[in-house]
Amino acid sequence: MAKFRRRTCIILSLFIVFIFSLMMGLKMLWPNAASFGPPFGLDLLPELRPPNTHLENKADFQRSDRIDMETNTKDLKGAGVTVHPPRASEVNLEELPPLNYFVHAFYYSWYGNPQFDGKYVHWNHPVLEHWDPRIAKNYPQGRHSPPDDIGSSFYPELGSYSSRDPSVIETHMKQMRSASIGVLALSWYPPDASDENGEATDYLVPTILDKAHKYNLKVTFHIEPYSNRDDQNMHQNVKYIIDKYGNHPAFYRYKTRMGHSLPMFYIYDSYITKPKTWANLLTPSGSQSVRGSPYDGLFIALLVEEKHKYDILQSGFDGIYTYFATNGFTYGSSHQNWNKLKSFCEKNNMIFIPSVGPGYIDTSIRPWNTQNTRNRINGKYYEVGLSAALQTQPSLISITSFNEWHEGTQIEKAVPKRTANTVYLDYRPHKPSLYLEITRKWSEKYSKERMTYALDQQLPAS
């Protein structure tokens, strides 16, 4: 038995010496400059590490904002990194593409998280019930539970961010600048007012204006349907906006063919208010008229149904926009009707602003609304819409949206994410910046084409 143990030990020792010698020999044969790098070639996956994005080590974001970058490699399942907004740094505008001030993007500042707001805001959006109880009973109820469960079918590269975070605002401005978007149309409620799922956001406007100005962007206002909106309080709110923000260099003014430089206001759900009430504000003889006053502007109505165009004309609006990103959902959002709407606007001296979106999916908050989902088809849906818009030779184009995550219309960067209960949609096989890049391409194309037919080539006034 002792001889057997001794023999075993000798054999084992010789085997270890052999393995050690083999490894040393291989090491000597391997080139000194060789490097294995990240396992599985992760350096070849652009989705995992967007270019020019700096990751800070300090725990600025909640642990919950960790984004799981899923790959189809089993060993990497569940791998995650915490993504922070890039640090504010000196901006070299020469390295960024030229702006197109005739391209506007709808922007939302209603998001919040515990770090900046003490709680999640909008990311925890409730699941909305269908109006028919017989249908509603077939779908889940309750609220989303961030950070892993948010009210969106996509997941932001910045995580469940706060719109109050200055670094987030700066990142958004840089993304829009990279897409050649010249103007952001800021969703706006009066001070101390908000949508039913949000908080007041007017106090953010100064920061948004400052950050926009840093990148030479302009800011216009997308006035939401706040409670009891009418001619009187609209007059007060227009006055408030112009008095408080009108002197900021980032405040947007549109130079008309007549040479007037006027603020622009998009009016969401304008059809809710009767034409007679709008006429009080928007016609020269109206009791609350802004016409010819320091608070005059270009007021753009939302057209949903075809009949709305006559109400819009009677109301005294200066133009129409179509907002919705779902082709075929409404008369206004249907591409096939845009040439007719453009002709109507031209005949009545109004501005036509078609709205184009990259897709639509709101089933995270309206699970019963699958019929209005529009697949992105790797950017093809977006490009078809942009092409249709350019064919009308519009004065302006609006993008729905930069960051309306609930309805899946965002062009902001999104990343892959998978949880135990949810697999979020993403932009693969392309990079998170896909829709910014598409926007830039078409913005540049639009800028060149517009020079051949438009009479108002001036830049917006500062």
UniProtKB/Swiss-Prot annotation:
Any GO molecular function: alpha-mannosidase activity
Any one of the GO CC terms: Golgi membrane
Cytoplasmic membrane side: 1-9
Entry's localization field: Golgi apparatus membrane
PTM note: Undergoes proteolytic cleavage in the C-terminal region.
Keywords: Golgi apparatus, Hydrolase, Membrane, Signal-anchor, Transmembrane, Transmembrane helix
Residues on Lumenal side: 31-462
Enzyme Commission no: 3.2.1.130
Region named Catalytic: 60-462
Bilayer-crossing regions: 10-30
EC top class named in words: hydrolase
Protein topology in the membrane: Single-pass type II membrane protein
Reactions accelerated catalytically: N-{alpha-Glc-(1->3)-alpha-Man-(1->2)-alpha-Man-(1->2)-alpha-Man-(1->3)-[alpha-Man-(1->2)-alpha-Man-(1->3)-[alpha-Man-(1->2)-alpha-Man-(1->6)]-alpha-Man-(1->6)]-beta-Man-(1->4)-beta-GlcNAc-(1->4)-beta-GlcNAc}-L-asparaginyl-[protein] + H2O = alpha-D-glucosyl-(1->3)-D-mannopyranose + N(4)-{alpha-D-Man-(1->2)-alpha-D-Man-(1->3)-[alpha-D-Man-(1->2)-alpha-D-Man-(1->3)-[alpha-D-Man-(1->2)-alpha-D-Man-(1->6)]-alpha-D-Man-(1->6)]-beta-D-Man-(1->4)-beta-D-GlaNAc-(1->4)-beta-D-GlcNAc}-L-asparaginyl-[protein] (N-glucan mannose isomer 8A1,2,3B1,2)
Family designation: Belongs to the glycosyl hydrolase 99 family.
PANTHER family assigned: ENDO-ALPHA-1,2-MANNOSIDASE, GLYCOPROTEIN ENDO-ALPHA-1,2-MANNOSIDASE
Name under which the protein is recorded: Glycoprotein endo-alpha-1,2-mannosidase
Species, as recorded: Rattus norvegicus
